[in-house]
Amino acid sequence: MLKFRTPDKVYFKKGCLPVALNELKYELKKSRALIVTDSNLYRNGYVDILTNLLNEIGVSYSVFSDSCALILTSNPPENGYSAIDEIEGCYVSDSAKPNLFTVQAGAGIARKQEPDILIAFGGGSVIDATKVIKLLYENPDANIPAIAEGETAFPPKKGKAYFIAIPTTSGKGSEVSPFAEIAEVDKTYQLASYELLPDMAIIDADVMATMPPELTAKSGISALYNAVYANISSLSTDYTEGLAERA
């Protein structure tokens, strides 16, 4: 028997981001966020969409990017932003997928910051990275290669941080899926478990409208590819086929 699960909450509407984030303060009573994002999104100011809203509701935050060294806080010693950490020996893989070093570094930052919210803000690779960062944050001794190879049982969620996925591109739907890929030079580790599933997904067209035209085209093709693949997969169900056809 196959089962199909999605995040506990899925917001799907143009302009829904502010409404969804209000839950953090007023319903979930959360106060400290670690944002995982793409360095290009940060440098081009797209992350301000998110951080401005967090400032409005009084949720403090730090930002961690795929370059590992971009660690920023909303509460520096004085006004403005300041770098609070750098990861020695950090590297960025040529692969579009996150690598082990990056997710281990992100988990290390999470253990220092002790956030009660983890927010993935970016494309599928950022969301995949955040899934594994959360896994390692809650289970510091977890061995990702061993888990991927089935040599070690998948550790359960421990609830240290509420996990929100906010996609900035269209693609494989990582924000509502229990999968993640971690790439090394000679190997890709594929993880599959509902323990990786975000607690909330926020799909806001206003966020995706910030994409440049070239990325919009590429991510649209990616979404089409994944929808076709999901429809013809031997593991598809009546439910997933309907979703794929609508995509």
Predicted regions and their residues:
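Carboxylate- and glycine-rich phosphate/diphosphate-binding segment that chelates Mg2+/Mn2+
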Residues: 179-247
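Generic structural signal for well-ordered, non-membrane alpha-helical segments
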Residues: 10, 17, 43, 47, ...
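N-terminal small/polar loop signature for handling phosphorylated ligands or for N-terminal nucleophile
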Residues: 47-142
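Cofactor-binding loop segments of dinucleotide-utilizing enzymes, especially the Rossmann-like FAD-
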Residues: 37-38, 66, 166-168
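N-terminal amphipathic/basic leader segments beginning at the initiator methionine
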Residues: 1-28
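Glycine-rich phosphate/diphosphate-binding loop of Rossmann-like nucleotide-binding domains
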Residues: 34-53
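Glycine/threonine-rich beta-strand-loop-alpha-helix active-site module
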Residues: 98-205
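Glycine-rich phosphate/diphosphate-binding loops that line cofactor/substrate pockets in enzymes
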Residues: 18-34, 55-56, 82
